[in-house]
Structures are given as C-alpha cells and as structure tokens.
Amino acid sequence: MTLEIRAACSPGEVRIAVMNDDTLVDFAIWRPGRTDGVGDLHRGRITARVPAMAGAFVALDGADGFLPDTEGAAGATAGTILGVQITRAAQGNKGPRLTAKLDAHEQAMIGSGPPVLVRRGPGPLSRLAALHPEAPVLLDDPGLAATLRPTLGARLTLVRAAFDAELSARIDALADPIVDLPGGASLSIHPTPALTAIDVDAGATTATRGVKGAVQFALNRGILPMLAAEIRLRNLSGAILVDFAGLAARRREALGPALTDALANDPLRPRLLGFTRLGLAEIVRPRIHPPLHELLVGPHAAGLAALRQAASDIAVNPGRALALRAAPSIIAALQPDPVALDDLARRAGRSLVLRADPSLHATAWVLEPAIA
C-alpha cells in the first residue's frame, strides 16, 4: 500500500486527493478565501440565552454561532465575552456549532474586547496530512508550496501537475448522482435537506444464471465497499438511507455486519442504526464540514470554475488578456474573496477584467478577450 496526497491548485481553490496506489480514498476542496471555519478560534459575545434549545447564540466576527449548554453555555448570560471554537460548519440557515471547552493556551489567546477571529483552524490539506502522516504531499503551485514547506518539510514535493487526466475524471465523477459499478449495477445518490437517499440498481447483473435471491444478496454484499467509499468521498453526512436491490426487507438485515465493516475505515465513524420496516438501511454520519454537493453549487463555486479555466487558458497562451463576463451574482461572490482574483493576477501578470451581465443565469459565465 502506497499512500500519496495530491493537491491540484487553481485560483482560490485547492482540490486534494488522497490516493492508495491507484485508488482514490479521500477527497476535499480547500478554498482559502472562503473557509468553512471549522477549528477557528474566536472571541465571542453571548447575545441571547435560548433555554428551549439548551444553549445560547454567540456573536462572532461576521457571523453568529450556537453554543450548547453542554459545551459551555450553561450559566452564562447575555453580554458575556468568552472564547469559542467552531466544531461544525454552518448548515443552511443554521450558524456554526461552537464549543467553549478550550485548553489553557487557547484560553490565554482570547483576551478582552469585541468579537474577533483569534486564529484560523487547519485547512483540509493540513487535516489530511495529519490523518496520513507518512504520505508524501505532491503540490503544483510554487507559491503555496513555499507557504506550506515550513510545516510539511521534506514531505512536500512540487510537481508540474498534481492530477492526471484519469484522476481528474474520477474527481469530476463525484459530482454525478449516478455511480456506475462493475457488472452493470449502479448507485443513485440524491441528497435532500433532510437526508441523503441512495438507491442500489442491480441493472443486468441479476440476469446471471443461478438462484435469484442468492445472486441479489451477493450483488448487494459486493457493492458495500464501493458504497462506503462514495459516502466518504462525497462527505455525505447526517441521515443516509440506502435501498438495496431486489431483496425482501427481512433479508436485508443480513447485510448489516458487512455494511458495518465497510464503514469502519471512515475516520468520521459512521454508524449503521439498523433497517426500517421497509428494509432501508439507516446510516448516520457526523456532519462537520459541508458535503461535496453543497460546495459544488452556487455563484462562488461557478466563479472559481471560471478562474480555473482562465488559468488553464493563460498557461497555454501567456500573453492573452481575458475578461470574465458572468452573472452579477458570480461577480459579487468573487469580489470579496481575498485570495482568488489576486491568485489569478499573480499567475497571469495582470488582473482579470470582470463584466457583470444580468442576462446570464445566476451561475453562467463566459471567458472572452479583455478588449472587446
């Protein structure tokens, strides 16, 4: 087994893949200009106690978070200044989850005054490097390599391209709700605000001669490692329901031990809670960071995709001056990003011209010559 961390850099974004030989075992997206905040240390101020929710709302620098009583809100009153750390990223209309259980060093950093960000938490690359301490890190941006070398040292190697075409295609496939499996079977993955539903489709595999029930059981058992891998790679979290293919509800419970084993390598320790009366496997996986499907949508994600394409075009034609014509929502999402546009300007030797076009869809964009 040879583990390797590959980090492909583009303006404002780093896509990070952990490889075990040729197998993708972990994936994360790091956006330094818009982090999810997990691990950040803040000086906050309690704004309201909410007994019905067993906690308190805390004003942070630019946001509000929720501090449960069990994490330090018990006994505190509105106006209290305290140190807190983000333990779970914001979700939908809910702010980040907090804890006030700090060590002595962190507590000494808090001081007094209005809410302020005291220290950034580790980014995805640092977290994955810590999770796989023996894995070398291959990175394709000299500027980021210089920043990370003091912490990663000899583990870090600068390469021309961290992702080859095959790995890029595998990463792109994580955005597809349909996962094709060997033998014609497939997974259909559909996140909703309440849960993620995963349907196993046997396809043509049950046409194999033999006892149909035995074939279907073997099929479902065989896809469990791939099911667990997709859950981890896509960072699916919260409630996950799996509808296995072609098995009576009472037979599906026999898949429980093998499914538990398949989930065991996931560092977030997802748990199989059991099977519903309809035979759906109930899995719960802690939500700490936003799932991949949330990171890939919206104006900011569209803008970073445009900058990635612009950087690729400029690498082929260094003298080309480009403009980004995009929906106003994309321009508005990119402008406050303190990293992305400056990163592209560093690569290109000039700033990207931004043109808001209200006629375009909210996530639509076009790269065009800067001089029209």
PLM feature spans:
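Flexible, charged surface loops at secondary-structure boundaries
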Residues: S10, V50-P51, T77-A78, R127-E134, ...
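Conserved glycine-centered short motifs in functionally critical loops
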Residues: L3, A54-V58, A90-A100, E106, ...
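Short, structured coil segments at secondary-structure junctions
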Residues: D61-G62, T151-L152, A348
